[in-house]
């Protein structure tokens, strides 16, 4: 998985407010179990990748895992003890904007107990609250 997009129209964007519920990406497509977010927040590449590794560790390579989020938004940050002004700061991190209801991961597996344990361990790696959804 790539940790940032290849090209963007602009290198830096405004942060914007993250409020409301998701009206897209809130249903299962390929899998029969999913990990759904229930609060707002940001997920960076390291969090997504560590959760993916935990899913692979518990589920094995036989079950199909689909990642539905990608870090496509840039966050900037000015260095410590720098006065205000003189432009926007350098790129600090790439994040994915998460709203309540977005499906983060999908799994195609038929044993609910194994999937439940794998999703629990994967959700511990994320900075937002999640729940398991199924068909």
Curated annotation (Swiss-Prot):
One of its GO terms (biological process) is translation. Pfam families: Ribosomal_L16 (PF00252). Keywords: Ribonucleoprotein, Ribosomal protein, RNA-binding, rRNA-binding, tRNA-binding. InterPro entries: Ribosomal_uL16, Ribosomal_uL16_bact-type, Ribosomal_uL16_CS, Ribosomal_uL16_dom, Ribosomal_uL16_sf. One of its GO terms (molecular function) is rRNA binding. Coiled coil: none annotated. CDD domains: Ribosomal_L16_L10e. GO terms for cellular component: ribonucleoprotein complex; ribosome. The keyword rRNA-binding applies. Part of the 50S ribosomal subunit. Belongs to the universal ribosomal protein uL16 family. Binds 23S rRNA and is also seen to make contacts with the A and possibly P site tRNAs. This is Large ribosomal subunit protein uL16. It comes from Carsonella ruddii (strain PV). The lineage of its organism: Bacteria, Pseudomonadati, Pseudomonadota, Gammaproteobacteria, Oceanospirillales. The gene is rplP.
